[in-house]
Amino acid sequence: MMASYPEPEDAAGALLAPETGRTVKEPEGPPPSPGKGGGGGGGTAPEKPDPAQKPPYSYVALIAMAIRESAEKRLTLSGIYQYIIAKFPFYEKNKKGWQNSIRHNLSLNECFIKVPREGGGERKGNYWTLDPACEDMFEKGNYRRRRRMKRPFRPPPAHFQPGKGLFGAGGAAGGCGVAGAGADGYGYLAPPKYLQSGFLNNSWPLPQPPSPMPYASCQMAAAAAAAAAAAAAAGPGSPGAAAVVKGLAGPAASYGPYTRVQSMALPPGVVNSYNGLGGPPAAPPPPPHPHPHPHAHHLHAAAAPPPAPPHHGAAAPPPGQLSPASPATAAPPAPAPTSAPGLQFACARQPELAMMHCSYWDHDSKTGALHSRLDL
């Protein structure tokens, strides 16, 4: 009787289980997922994942998985939530933060397109679908490995394009004298141009400090003072003395506070007392002009010789002078005429004008009075 040998496969099984007589078969792999987007089984999720373990998929992969396994290849936001919770129980127990991440990825990722609902806006919520250009964004259907997608080129906005200003084409704001577009076309990157070259050439000069008195005016004032001293030394009745003293109020000395008194229309007595020269009242001088330069009639009036002074005790003093015998009975000086309103005395020692002249002063006193008048 011949012995029979089992087949190689049965022999291998007999070695593993000799007593039972049953062969042990190799374990089979897990059945493929019923989903349509498996693509080889590499990217499919397990049937019964561990609820305590977070799935190893990104939020973009979860959204793409939910959309691909839907019947219409599109889902609303609430439909995506329901699919993720049903597929992965981990997200059902941990609802903190992941729903916001799903919304952000739908809005910011270019692979997802929003499709409005049919029938207007009566029902809330829009559909989300995949961009046909991003169908193969996962390598061989593996949701754990995502390909690097090349983003399509998009032209920059109008205000960033070269050759255009910040406020319009051609840099229109640059010609208005403000911070406009520079040579590179980007107005906000160019250095500000607050002043154009044409404006700088035609700009107004800056205010300068006032200049001091000209040197010529000082020389003329000094020459007039020397001439007045020489005329006073010649004699009190000399016609040149009155002309020189009255001529001190010319344009060179018209800016002084004390020499300007002579250009005003004062009573004859006050003028004669101030000058230290005696004599009868003379005709009042013409009113002063608003401009400082002299005219011909001014020079003729200044050069006219005054009348001869009275002798001592021959006649009563004129009404503006005081005699030693009756100092209290002298008439006060007449007020200045009101024909030139706005004119005021610039001399601070005006009350002493009537006391500066005395008929008993000698020649030296009059010379000293003239010097004190010039030094004021």
Swiss-Prot record:
<dbReference type="GO" id="GO:0048048">
    <property type="term" value="P:embryonic eye morphogenesis"/>
</dbReference>
<dbReference type="GO" id="GO:0060065">
    <property type="term" value="P:uterus development"/>
</dbReference>
<keyword id="KW-0597">Phosphoprotein</keyword>
<dbReference type="GO" id="GO:0046881">
    <property type="term" value="P:positive regulation of follicle-stimulating hormone secretion"/>
</dbReference>
<dbReference type="GO" id="GO:0005654">
    <property type="term" value="C:nucleoplasm"/>
</dbReference>
<feature type="compositionally biased region" description="Basic residues">
    <location>
        <begin position="290"/>
        <end position="300"/>
    </location>
</feature>
<feature type="region of interest" description="Disordered">
    <location>
        <begin position="1"/>
        <end position="53"/>
    </location>
</feature>
<keyword id="KW-0238">DNA-binding</keyword>
<dbReference type="InterPro" id="IPR036388">
    <property type="entry name" value="WH-like_DNA-bd_sf"/>
</dbReference>
<keyword id="KW-0804">Transcription</keyword>
<feature type="compositionally biased region" description="Gly residues">
    <location>
        <begin position="35"/>
        <end position="44"/>
    </location>
</feature>
<keyword id="KW-1066">Premature ovarian failure</keyword>
<dbReference type="InterPro" id="IPR030456">
    <property type="entry name" value="TF_fork_head_CS_2"/>
</dbReference>
<dbReference type="GO" id="GO:0043065">
    <property type="term" value="P:positive regulation of apoptotic process"/>
</dbReference>
<dbReference type="GO" id="GO:0031624">
    <property type="term" value="F:ubiquitin conjugating enzyme binding"/>
</dbReference>
<keyword id="KW-1017">Isopeptide bond</keyword>
<dbReference type="InterPro" id="IPR047515">
    <property type="entry name" value="FH_FOXL2"/>
</dbReference>
<keyword id="KW-0221">Differentiation</keyword>
<comment type="subunit">
    <text>Interacts with ESR1. Interacts with SMAD3. Interacts with DDX20. Interacts with UBE2I/UBC9.</text>
</comment>
<feature type="region of interest" description="Disordered">
    <location>
        <begin position="276"/>
        <end position="342"/>
    </location>
</feature>
<dbReference type="Pfam" id="PF00250">
    <property type="entry name" value="Forkhead"/>
</dbReference>
<dbReference type="GO" id="GO:0000978">
    <property type="term" value="F:RNA polymerase II cis-regulatory region sequence-specific DNA binding"/>
</dbReference>
<dbReference type="GO" id="GO:0000122">
    <property type="term" value="P:negative regulation of transcription by RNA polymerase II"/>
</dbReference>
<dbReference type="GO" id="GO:1990837">
    <property type="term" value="F:sequence-specific double-stranded DNA binding"/>
</dbReference>
<dbReference type="GO" id="GO:0030331">
    <property type="term" value="F:nuclear estrogen receptor binding"/>
</dbReference>
<dbReference type="GO" id="GO:0000785">
    <property type="term" value="C:chromatin"/>
</dbReference>
<dbReference type="GO" id="GO:0003677">
    <property type="term" value="F:DNA binding"/>
</dbReference>
<protein>
    <recommendedName>
        <fullName>Forkhead box protein L2</fullName>
    </recommendedName>
</protein>
<dbReference type="GO" id="GO:0009653">
    <property type="term" value="P:anatomical structure morphogenesis"/>
</dbReference>
<feature type="cross-link" description="Glycyl lysine isopeptide (Lys-Gly) (interchain with G-Cter in SUMO)">
    <location>
        <position position="25"/>
    </location>
</feature>
<dbReference type="GO" id="GO:0033686">
    <property type="term" value="P:positive regulation of luteinizing hormone secretion"/>
</dbReference>
<keyword id="KW-0832">Ubl conjugation</keyword>
<dbReference type="GO" id="GO:0045892">
    <property type="term" value="P:negative regulation of DNA-templated transcription"/>
</dbReference>
<dbReference type="GO" id="GO:0005634">
    <property type="term" value="C:nucleus"/>
</dbReference>
<comment type="function">
    <text>Transcriptional regulator. Critical factor essential for ovary differentiation and maintenance, and repression of the genetic program for somatic testis determination. Prevents trans-differentiation of ovary to testis through transcriptional repression of the Sertoli cell-promoting gene SOX9. Has apoptotic activity in ovarian cells. Suppresses ESR1-mediated transcription of PTGS2/COX2 stimulated by tamoxifen. Is a regulator of CYP19 expression. Participates in SMAD3-dependent transcription of FST via the intronic SMAD-binding element. Is a transcriptional repressor of STAR.</text>
</comment>
<dbReference type="GO" id="GO:0006357">
    <property type="term" value="P:regulation of transcription by RNA polymerase II"/>
</dbReference>
<dbReference type="GO" id="GO:0001555">
    <property type="term" value="P:oocyte growth"/>
</dbReference>
<keyword id="KW-0539">Nucleus</keyword>
<feature type="compositionally biased region" description="Pro residues">
    <location>
        <begin position="304"/>
        <end position="321"/>
    </location>
</feature>
<feature type="DNA-binding region" description="Fork-head">
    <location>
        <begin position="54"/>
        <end position="148"/>
    </location>
</feature>
<dbReference type="InterPro" id="IPR036390">
    <property type="entry name" value="WH_DNA-bd_sf"/>
</dbReference>
<dbReference type="GO" id="GO:0019101">
    <property type="term" value="P:female somatic sex determination"/>
</dbReference>
